[in-house]
Curated annotation (Swiss-Prot):
InterPro entries: Cadherin-domain_protein, Cadherin-like_dom, Cadherin-like_sf, Cadherin_CS, Cadherin_pro_dom, Cadherin_Y-type_LIR, Catenin-bd_sf, Desmosomal_cadherin. Glycans are attached at residues 163, 398, 545. Residues 30-132 form a propeptide. It is a single-pass type I membrane protein. This is Desmocollin-1. Pfam families: CADH_Y-type_LIR (PF01049), Cadherin (PF00028), Cadherin_pro (PF08758). Its main location: membrane. The chain crosses the membrane at residues 693-715. The keyword Calcium applies.
Length: 893
């Protein structure tokens, strides 16, 4: 059993060393075996083979004491990596039996090849006879051998058989490797046998090793390498790499044009007669005429004629054969199908189905289709070789017609794009030609003499009353600038084509931007209604446009444009658009004047600049290039504003005097001048206005002031009125109380009522009205004969029905007097109400309210309004049950 090797230092290696140590200590030694090996051993090289069964019959564990070697189950010794043996090397094979037979050890001694003798000792070397090594015998096996099996292959013999009893064995592919058990050897005779037939296409050769060992496992010979080569048998027929192959070739191609190359495969041994292939064409479909041939050795298919015509046959099929053995009749063969498609060429010119066409169209019709023409083309449809391109060769010098191709039907579509005039031309003859998108390629056998087919189209124009004509569409007339009003100008003239004159036509102006003209309805002439001005913003490039419509009696019309070209007149003097000039003393002591002239160049520069006598004392002006001038102070001027009168003339003397505002400033550039400009100051004054928020603030302020004055007036008037309590005051009163909590117990004679305080009186401002008079809040109350007043010391407002008259009382009693008066009476009445509830409930009584107070506008408010009696609280004795909750609330619990 083979054991995988482990790297030194690993855990597995440590365990392996421990196992070897145990085996060495407790195992018996078998016979030593010496093996002759070369001094250099490659990795996985076979060192030798040992008969392990002679030492231990059944070994379950096979180990090597040296990690440079590994031992197989059959006793073969292999290296684990490349080794260089300078001298002998020894190691042990350790065998262990799990059935209890013990452990065995086989010592292996490797003897390296002969030592090299230094050159200086070459003469001292003794010539010795070396032992002849058993040489391999060349051997081969026939593929697909019929036997009988086992079939004798070869015999190996070792010269050591003269001195030892030699046993032979083999290993390698076919023995202990795939394919297993193909070869075996008789260990006594060395005869090697083959057990079955071999397929060379699967195994070309078998490299195996033969071993010669003694009974005790000694190997007196090196392993003998044997190579059994399998001789090829022609058992594989060639076949085409692709069963169906498609080639393409242009039609009408030259003779000898390569169509394609076919390739076949033969699995037999290369470079032998078994793989020497020959190609030939067995059949061409269709067969007549024969167009193709194939090279027998290379398989290249070529054309044999230039007469390939796709329109006759677009596809050919070739049945081809490939045969080995150089094409001999006894060689193996196979067939395949080759499809050759012909590529279309533009070898057929399109042609019209009709030689001539006739069509009618009404005059003045445009963008209308008048005719469709079909063509035939034998080339491949929907390709550049068959798509038609039409041309109008003659008769369309004015561009009246347009011809195009319908992409769906390939027809020619003839259209009218400009109106036809029956009065000018009643019939038009067109010559139309057709070509393909692709260039024409004439075939060898073609009889075509021209590549373009033509046809004739006769277009007859039908008469139609189309109305007036405005020809030309734009008419130009010249006029002087500044032409006065009332001047007549030649207008636009239209023509009726039916009559050849403009008689009976009417004219109307449809566009006149600045309304300069009026038009004569019958003649179309213009008359000025404004002075013509070339410098107007409506004039572009000295031209002013007027659009005119001409119409006949039937309402048919045409439109024309009249361009009035205005000749320039020197009617505008030079102007300076610079509103204010700034001289920065720290930059330069002058300013540049740049006048403009609205007139044309002939009435413009050069300009002449003349200072007024008053201005020439402080200023000088210098003309630079006839278009600009420099204004400079004669001396250093103070920082201030200046006005400089200056006259500017053009080349013809038209002039104007300008007052130039100039500011001399302490700055570097004009934008840094801190001195506000005259224009900005004037603009600031002109732009001052009241905004909506300012107006609103003023209105609200006025209203607030009026309110304050009115309040002060009212307060002053109230202080001057004598406050008194009239004798005829009403006996019905309402007591204001904000108390929401319960009162004392019913049996308690003292009923404490809360007071209501407010600081509003301190501000002397009315907080509510009753009957149109101001009412102030109360601080303390007093009851006198049913009336309630405020304490005068507190300054509170009266809260009675008489308050509607504006009468207030400063109060006659204090709060304690009022409290002492009402407390015992309320308690007594509540008690009596509870004692005689049944009787008092069923009493039906009437209260008199004969006197309600002088001037009162309201009726009585209850039975408690009787102020004539001081003890006027008897009504509390007759409270109904629904008032019990109110009574309990007023009693302190």
């Amino acid at each position: 059993m083979a054991v995988a090797s482990a790297a030194p230092g690993s855990i597995f290696w440590k365990q392996l060393l421990f196992s070897l140590l145990v085996l060495i200590l407790f195992c018996d030694a078998c016979q030593k075996i010496s093996l002759q090996v070369p001094s250099h051993l490659r990795a996985e090289a076979l060192v030798g083979k040992v008969n392990l069964k002679e030492c231990l019959q059944s070994a379950s564990l096979i180990l090597s004491s040296d990690p440079d070697f590994r031992i197989l189950e059959d006793g073969s010794i292999y290296t684990t990596h490349d080794l260089v043996l300078s001298s002998g090397k020894s190691f042990s094979i350790l065998l262990s039996d799990s059935q209890g037979q013990g452990q065995k050890e086989i010592e292996i001694i490797l003897e390296a090849g002969g030592k090299k003798v230094p050159k200086r000792h070459m003469k001292d070397a003794v010539l010795r006879r070396t032992k002849r090594r058993w040489a391999p015998i060349p051997c081969s096996l026939m593929e697909n051998s019929l036997g009988p099996f086992p079939q004798h292959v070869q015999q190996v013999q070792s010269d050591a058989a003269q001195n030892y009893t030699i046993f032979y064995s083999i290993s390698g592919p076919g023995v202990d490797k795939e394919p297993f058990n193909l070869f075996f050897i008789e260990k006594d005779t060395g005869d090697i046998f083959c057990t079955r037939s071999i397929d060379r296409e699967q195994y070309q050769e078998f490299p195996i090793y033969a071993y010669a060992t003694t009974a005790d496992g000694y190997a007196p010979e090196y392993p003998l390498p044997l190579v059994f080569k399998v001789e090829d048998d022609n058992d594989n027929a060639p076949y085409f790499e692709n069963k169906l192959t498609v080639f393409t070739v242009p039609e009408n191609c030259r003779t000898g044009t390569s169509v394609g190359k076919v390739t076949a495969i033969d699995l037999d041994e290369p470079d032998t007669l078994h793989t020497r292939l020959k190609y030939k064409i067995l059949q061409q479909i269709p067969n007549n005429p024969r167009h193709f041939t194939v090279h027998p050795d290379t398989g290249v298919i070529t054309t044999t004629t230039p007469l390939l015509d796709r329109e006759k046959c677009d596809t050919y099929k070739l049945i081809m054969e490939v045969r080995d053995m150089g094409g001999q009749p006894f060689g193996l063969f196979n067939t395949g199908t080759i499809t050759i498609s012909l590529e279309d060429e533009n070898d057929n010119a399109p042609y019209f189905t009709e030689t001539s066409y006739t069509v009618e169209v009404e005059e003045n019709r445009i963008d209308v289709e008048i005719l469709r023409m079909a063509v035939h083309d034998h080339d491949l449809p929907n390709t550049p070789h068959s798509r038609a391109v039409y041309q109008i060769l003659q008769g369309n010098e004015n561009g009246t017609f347009k011809i195009s191709t319908d992409p769906n039907t390939n027809e020619a579509v003839l259209c009218v794009v400009k109106p036809l005039n029956y009065e000018v031309n009643r019939q038009v003859v067109l010559q139309i030609g057709v070509l393909n998108e692709a260039q024409f390629a004439k075939a060898v056998n073609s009889k075509t003499t021209t590549t373009m087919c033509t046809t004739v189209v006769t277009v007859k124009v039908k008469d139609h009353d189309e109305g007036p004509e405005c020809q030309p569409p734009v008419k130009v007339i010249q006029s002087e600038d500044c032409l006065p009003t009332g001047t007549e100008l030649l207008g636009y003239k239209a023509v009726d084509p039916e009559r050849g004159t403009g008689e009976g036509l009417r004219y109307k102006k449809i566009q006149d931007e600045d309304n300069w003209f009026e038009i004569n309805e019958y003649t179309g002439d213009l008359k000025t209604v404004k002075v013509l001005d070339r410098e107007s913003t409506f004039v572009k490039n000295n031209q002013y446009n007027v659009s005119v419509i001409a119409f006949d009696a039937d309402g048919r019309s045409c439109t024309g444009t009249l361009v009035v070209f205005l000749e320039d007149k020197n009617d505008h003097p030079p102007q300076i658009k610079q509103e204010e000039l700034t001289i920065c003393r720290h930059d330069k002591d002058y300013v540049v004047l740049e006048p403009t002239d609205q007139d044309g160049p002939d009435n413009g520069p050069p300009f002449q600049f003349i200072l007024d006598n008053s201005a020439s004392k402080l200023w000088t002006v210098e003309t630079r290039d006839g278009k600009t001038a420099i204004l400079r102070g004669r001396q250093d001027l103070d920082y201030d504003y200046y006005t400089v009168p200056i006259q500017i003339k053009d080349r013809h003397g038209a002039s104007a005097t300008h007052i130039l505002p100039v500011r001399v400033c302490d700055c570097t550039i004009p934008s840094e001048c801190r001195m506000p400009s005259k224009l900005s100051r004037e603009a600031a004054l002109a732009n001052v206005f009241l905004g909506k928020w300012a107006i609103l603030a003023m209105v609200l302020g006025s209203v607030l002031l009026l309110c304050i004055l009115f309040t002060c007036f009212c307060v002053t008037v109230k202080k001057t009125v004598k406050k008194c309590f009239p004798e005829d005051v009403a006996q019905q009163n309402l007591i204001v109380s904000n108390t929401e909590g319960p009162g004392e117990e019913v049996m308690d004679a003292n009923i404490r009522l809360p007071t209501q305080t407010s600081n509003v009186c301190d501000t002397s401002i009315s907080v509510g009205t009753l009957g149109g008079q101001g009412v102030k809040t109360q601080q303390s109350f007093e009851m006198v004969k049913g009336g309630y007043t405020l304490d005068a010391n507190k300054g509170g407002g009266h809260q009675t029905l008489e308050s509607v008259k504006g009468v207030t009382d400063t109060g006659r009693y204090t709060y304690s007097d009022w409290h002492n008066f009402t407390q015992p009476r309320l308690g007594e009445k509540v008690y009596l109400c509870g004692q005689d509830e049944e009787h008092k409930l069923c009493e039906d009584y009437v209260r008199s309210y004969s006197y309600e107070g002088k001037g009162s506008v309201a009726g009585s408010v209850g039975c408690c309004s009787d102020r004539q009696e001081e003890e006027g609280l008897d009504f509390l004795d007759h409270l109904e049950p629904k008032f019990r909750t109110l009574a309990k609330t007023c009693v302190k619990k």
